[in-house]
Amino acid sequence: MNIVYSLANQLKDSLRDLLPVVLVMGFFQLVVIRQPLPDSLALLDLVLGLVFVVVGLTLFIKGLELGLFPLGENLARAFVKKGSVAWLLIFAFALGFGSTVAEPALIAVAARAGEVVSESGLIADTSAAQASFAFTLRMVVALSVGTAVVVGVLRIFKGWPLHLMIIAGYIIVLLLTLFAPNELIGIAYDSGGVTTSTITVPLVTALGVGLASTIKGRNPMLDGFGLIAFASVMPIIFVLLFGIFGLSLVTGST
Protein backbone atom coordinates (compact mmCIF):
# COMPACT_ATOMS: atom_id res chain seq x y z
CA MET A 1 0.00 0.00 0.00
CA ASN A 2 2.87 2.34 0.79
CA ILE A 3 4.34 1.90 -2.69
CA VAL A 4 0.97 2.78 -4.29
CA TYR A 5 0.68 5.91 -2.16
CA SER A 6 4.28 6.83 -2.95
CA LEU A 7 3.72 6.34 -6.69
CA ALA A 8 0.59 8.49 -6.54
CA ASN A 9 2.54 11.30 -4.88
CA GLN A 10 5.34 10.97 -7.42
CA LEU A 11 2.81 11.07 -10.27
CA LYS A 12 1.41 14.29 -8.85
CA ASP A 13 4.92 15.76 -8.61
CA SER A 14 5.69 14.76 -12.21
CA LEU A 15 2.50 16.43 -13.44
CA ARG A 16 3.40 19.57 -11.52
CA ASP A 17 6.94 19.61 -12.92
CA LEU A 18 5.83 19.11 -16.53
CA LEU A 19 2.86 21.48 -16.41
CA PRO A 20 4.91 24.69 -16.99
CA VAL A 21 6.49 23.19 -20.13
CA VAL A 22 3.09 22.15 -21.50
CA LEU A 23 1.59 25.58 -20.72
CA VAL A 24 4.45 27.44 -22.41
CA MET A 25 4.28 25.32 -25.56
CA GLY A 26 0.48 25.54 -25.67
CA PHE A 27 0.55 29.32 -25.20
CA PHE A 28 2.97 29.91 -28.05
CA GLN A 29 1.15 27.45 -30.33
CA LEU A 30 -2.31 28.90 -29.72
CA VAL A 31 -1.67 32.57 -28.91
CA VAL A 32 1.57 33.55 -30.66
CA ILE A 33 1.76 31.29 -33.73
CA ARG A 34 -2.03 30.90 -33.96
CA GLN A 35 -1.87 27.89 -36.20
CA PRO A 36 -3.43 24.44 -35.84
CA LEU A 37 -1.25 21.44 -35.18
CA PRO A 38 0.50 20.07 -38.29
CA ASP A 39 -1.16 17.14 -40.03
CA SER A 40 1.73 14.89 -39.03
CA LEU A 41 0.94 15.48 -35.33
CA ALA A 42 -2.45 14.06 -34.38
CA LEU A 43 -4.07 15.30 -31.19
CA LEU A 44 -4.42 11.74 -29.87
CA ASP A 45 -0.71 11.11 -30.44
CA LEU A 46 0.10 14.33 -28.59
CA VAL A 47 -2.04 13.39 -25.60
CA LEU A 48 -0.66 9.85 -25.51
CA GLY A 49 2.87 11.20 -25.72
CA LEU A 50 2.29 13.48 -22.73
CA VAL A 51 0.78 10.61 -20.75
CA PHE A 52 3.77 8.40 -21.56
CA VAL A 53 6.16 11.15 -20.46
CA VAL A 54 4.39 11.66 -17.13
CA VAL A 55 4.12 7.94 -16.36
CA GLY A 56 7.65 7.22 -17.56
CA LEU A 57 9.14 10.05 -15.50
CA THR A 58 7.22 8.88 -12.44
CA LEU A 59 8.42 5.29 -12.73
CA PHE A 60 11.98 6.39 -13.52
CA ILE A 61 12.31 8.65 -10.49
CA LYS A 62 10.70 6.10 -8.18
CA GLY A 63 13.01 3.42 -9.54
CA LEU A 64 16.02 5.60 -8.76
CA GLU A 65 14.82 6.19 -5.21
CA LEU A 66 14.07 2.53 -4.55
CA GLY A 67 17.01 0.89 -6.28
CA LEU A 68 19.83 2.83 -7.88
CA PHE A 69 20.38 5.50 -5.23
CA PRO A 70 20.71 3.01 -2.33
CA LEU A 71 22.75 0.63 -4.47
CA GLY A 72 25.21 3.34 -5.53
CA GLU A 73 25.71 4.57 -1.99
CA ASN A 74 26.08 1.06 -0.58
CA LEU A 75 28.66 0.10 -3.22
CA ALA A 76 30.68 3.21 -2.48
CA ARG A 77 30.65 2.46 1.25
CA ALA A 78 31.54 -1.19 0.66
CA PHE A 79 34.57 -0.31 -1.49
CA VAL A 80 35.85 2.16 1.12
CA LYS A 81 35.38 -0.26 4.02
CA LYS A 82 37.13 -2.97 2.03
CA GLY A 83 40.04 -0.60 1.45
CA SER A 84 40.17 -1.33 -2.27
CA VAL A 85 40.85 2.07 -3.83
CA ALA A 86 41.85 0.56 -7.18
CA TRP A 87 38.56 -1.31 -7.53
CA LEU A 88 36.68 1.80 -6.43
CA LEU A 89 38.31 3.83 -9.20
CA ILE A 90 37.55 1.10 -11.74
CA PHE A 91 33.95 1.07 -10.54
CA ALA A 92 33.78 4.88 -10.73
CA PHE A 93 35.03 4.89 -14.32
CA ALA A 94 32.68 2.08 -15.34
CA LEU A 95 29.74 3.84 -13.70
CA GLY A 96 30.47 7.13 -15.47
CA PHE A 97 31.11 5.46 -18.82
CA GLY A 98 28.14 3.09 -18.68
CA SER A 99 25.58 5.64 -17.54
CA THR A 100 26.67 8.12 -20.21
CA VAL A 101 26.60 5.65 -23.10
CA ALA A 102 22.99 4.90 -22.17
CA GLU A 103 22.05 8.59 -21.84
CA PRO A 104 19.09 9.27 -24.19
CA ALA A 105 19.96 12.96 -24.52
CA LEU A 106 23.50 12.14 -25.67
CA ILE A 107 22.25 9.60 -28.22
CA ALA A 108 19.87 12.17 -29.72
CA VAL A 109 22.41 15.01 -29.76
CA ALA A 110 25.16 12.81 -31.23
CA ALA A 111 22.90 11.71 -34.08
CA ARG A 112 21.92 15.29 -34.87
CA ALA A 113 25.54 16.44 -34.58
CA GLY A 114 26.56 13.85 -37.18
CA GLU A 115 24.07 15.31 -39.64
CA VAL A 116 25.17 18.89 -39.05
CA VAL A 117 28.90 18.14 -39.22
CA SER A 118 28.46 16.24 -42.49
CA GLU A 119 26.57 19.18 -43.97
CA SER A 120 29.42 21.49 -42.97
CA GLY A 121 31.90 19.38 -44.96
CA LEU A 122 34.00 18.33 -41.98
CA ILE A 123 33.12 14.71 -42.72
CA ALA A 124 31.68 13.03 -45.80
CA ASP A 125 27.99 13.63 -46.44
CA THR A 126 27.01 9.97 -46.17
CA SER A 127 24.92 8.03 -43.68
CA ALA A 128 27.94 5.86 -42.83
CA ALA A 129 30.06 8.90 -41.99
CA GLN A 130 27.26 10.40 -39.90
CA ALA A 131 26.76 7.16 -37.98
CA SER A 132 30.51 6.81 -37.43
CA PHE A 133 30.78 10.38 -36.14
CA ALA A 134 27.78 9.95 -33.82
CA PHE A 135 29.16 6.69 -32.39
CA THR A 136 32.66 8.10 -31.93
CA LEU A 137 31.28 11.23 -30.28
CA ARG A 138 29.29 9.11 -27.84
CA MET A 139 32.38 7.06 -26.97
CA VAL A 140 34.50 10.19 -26.49
CA VAL A 141 31.91 11.77 -24.20
CA ALA A 142 31.43 8.52 -22.26
CA LEU A 143 35.19 8.19 -21.76
CA SER A 144 35.33 11.78 -20.57
CA VAL A 145 32.60 11.27 -17.99
CA GLY A 146 34.25 8.09 -16.75
CA THR A 147 37.50 10.03 -16.36
CA ALA A 148 35.64 12.89 -14.66
CA VAL A 149 34.10 10.58 -12.07
CA VAL A 150 37.53 9.08 -11.32
CA VAL A 151 38.98 12.57 -10.83
CA GLY A 152 36.03 13.48 -8.62
CA VAL A 153 36.48 10.38 -6.48
CA LEU A 154 40.18 11.15 -6.06
CA ARG A 155 39.24 14.68 -5.02
CA ILE A 156 36.98 13.31 -2.28
CA PHE A 157 39.79 11.04 -1.03
CA LYS A 158 42.48 13.72 -1.14
CA GLY A 159 40.38 16.73 -0.15
CA TRP A 160 41.48 18.79 -3.15
CA PRO A 161 39.71 22.17 -3.50
CA LEU A 162 36.84 21.86 -5.96
CA HIS A 163 36.82 25.47 -7.14
CA LEU A 164 40.47 25.47 -8.17
CA MET A 165 40.06 22.26 -10.18
CA ILE A 166 36.97 23.60 -11.97
CA ILE A 167 38.73 26.89 -12.76
CA ALA A 168 41.70 24.97 -14.17
CA GLY A 169 39.33 22.87 -16.26
CA TYR A 170 37.68 25.87 -17.86
CA ILE A 171 41.05 27.49 -18.54
CA ILE A 172 41.96 24.35 -20.50
CA VAL A 173 38.61 24.60 -22.32
CA LEU A 174 39.32 28.19 -23.35
CA LEU A 175 42.79 27.32 -24.61
CA LEU A 176 41.58 24.31 -26.61
CA THR A 177 38.77 26.39 -28.13
CA LEU A 178 41.40 28.48 -29.91
CA PHE A 179 42.59 25.45 -31.89
CA ALA A 180 39.45 23.33 -32.34
CA PRO A 181 37.46 23.32 -35.61
CA ASN A 182 34.72 25.95 -35.48
CA GLU A 183 32.12 23.35 -36.49
CA LEU A 184 32.80 21.34 -33.32
CA ILE A 185 33.04 24.10 -30.71
CA GLY A 186 29.30 24.37 -30.13
CA ILE A 187 28.92 20.59 -30.06
CA ALA A 188 31.74 20.34 -27.52
CA TYR A 189 30.20 22.93 -25.22
CA ASP A 190 26.77 21.32 -25.44
CA SER A 191 28.21 17.88 -24.70
CA GLY A 192 28.88 19.02 -21.15
CA GLY A 193 25.17 19.63 -20.69
CA VAL A 194 23.68 16.53 -22.26
CA THR A 195 25.75 14.26 -20.04
CA THR A 196 24.27 15.73 -16.85
CA SER A 197 20.80 14.37 -17.48
CA THR A 198 18.38 11.72 -16.29
CA ILE A 199 20.67 8.72 -15.88
CA THR A 200 24.14 10.07 -15.14
CA VAL A 201 23.29 12.63 -12.46
CA PRO A 202 21.48 10.34 -9.97
CA LEU A 203 24.05 7.55 -10.20
CA VAL A 204 27.10 9.80 -9.91
CA THR A 205 25.55 11.84 -7.11
CA ALA A 206 24.77 8.67 -5.16
CA LEU A 207 28.40 7.58 -5.53
CA GLY A 208 29.77 10.91 -4.31
CA VAL A 209 27.46 11.18 -1.31
CA GLY A 210 28.10 7.56 -0.36
CA LEU A 211 31.86 8.08 -0.45
CA ALA A 212 31.82 11.32 1.53
CA SER A 213 29.56 9.72 4.15
CA THR A 214 31.98 6.85 4.64
CA ILE A 215 35.44 8.44 4.49
CA LYS A 216 36.56 9.79 7.84
CA GLY A 217 36.95 13.56 7.91
CA ARG A 218 34.73 14.18 4.87
CA ASN A 219 31.46 16.09 4.97
CA PRO A 220 28.75 14.81 2.59
CA MET A 221 27.48 18.36 2.03
CA LEU A 222 30.92 19.81 1.30
CA ASP A 223 32.68 16.86 -0.32
CA GLY A 224 29.89 14.59 -1.56
CA PHE A 225 28.78 16.93 -4.31
CA GLY A 226 30.85 18.28 -7.18
CA LEU A 227 31.20 15.14 -9.29
CA ILE A 228 28.59 16.52 -11.69
CA ALA A 229 30.72 19.63 -12.16
CA PHE A 230 33.59 17.45 -13.38
CA ALA A 231 31.16 15.52 -15.57
CA SER A 232 30.16 18.83 -17.16
CA VAL A 233 33.59 20.26 -17.95
CA MET A 234 35.48 17.10 -18.87
CA PRO A 235 33.34 16.26 -21.95
CA ILE A 236 34.03 19.72 -23.35
CA ILE A 237 37.77 19.12 -23.06
CA PHE A 238 37.59 15.65 -24.59
CA VAL A 239 35.38 16.67 -27.52
CA LEU A 240 37.61 19.65 -28.30
CA LEU A 241 40.63 17.32 -28.27
CA PHE A 242 38.68 14.95 -30.50
CA GLY A 243 38.08 17.80 -32.92
CA ILE A 244 41.76 18.75 -32.97
CA PHE A 245 43.39 15.33 -33.08
CA GLY A 246 40.80 12.59 -33.52
CA LEU A 247 38.59 13.32 -36.52
CA SER A 248 40.60 10.79 -38.52
CA LEU A 249 38.88 8.11 -36.42
CA VAL A 250 35.60 8.91 -38.16
CA THR A 251 34.79 6.90 -41.28
CA GLY A 252 34.59 9.28 -44.20
CA SER A 253 36.34 12.22 -42.53
CA THR A 254 37.68 14.82 -44.93
Curated annotation (Swiss-Prot):
> InterPro entries recorded for this chain?
UmpAB (IPR011435)
According to its UniProt entry, what is the function of this protein?
Part of a two-component antiporter that catalyzes the efflux of Na(+), Li(+) and K(+) in exchange for external protons. Shows a preference for Na(+), followed by K(+) and Li(+).
Domain of life of the source: Bacteria
Location (main, coarse): membrane
Family of this protein: Belongs to the UmpA/UmpB family.
One of its GO biological process terms is: potassium ion transport
One matching Pfam family is: DUF1538
**One of the record's GO cellular component terms:** plasma membrane
The protein in question is named Na(+), Li(+), K(+)/H(+) antiporter subunit A
Q: Which GO terms describe its molecular function?
A: antiporter activity
Q: Which organism is it from?
A: Vreelandella zhaodongensis
Is the Iron-sulfur keyword given for this protein?
A: no
- Subunit comment for this entry? Heterodimer composed of UmpA and UmpB.
- Tell me which UniProt keywords the record has, alphabetically: Antiport, Cell membrane, Ion transport, Membrane, Potassium, Potassium transport, Sodium, Sodium transport, Transmembrane, Transmembrane helix, Transport
